[in-house]
Amino acid sequence: HAPDPVTQTMTRLAANDEARHVAFGVAHLKESVKHDPHLLDRLNQSVHRRHDALQHIVGLNQEVIDALTLITAGGWSHQALRKGSQQVTKLIQDMDSGRRNQLLRLGFSKEQAATLSELHTKNFM
């Protein structure tokens, strides 16, 4: 979703780059878990500590939401903005689902994956 070809290309390349980073990290952790059964516990504790340290960050700031909405809307009409808003909501849901799936692949239970995903800082970090 982009208002012009350059932004569309940049967005696609950034998404591909992020997917590679996540795939590498998950593959590395998955292999590490095989050799260190306590790693999942330490990762769990790390997520909780990070959440506690950053708990003042309660969500995406409005400027980020507005920018994402405008980029995905592709226009200024009420209909386009509504579509953009729906797409941003779907993006956030898809990111949660993706985090949960990656955590399941690492060996966390469904409940642990849901809890850890919920603790994720809601600012795309």
Where are these regions (language model features)?
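Inter-helical turn/loop segments and adjacent helix faces that build the functional surface
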Residues: 1-13, 27-42, 69-73
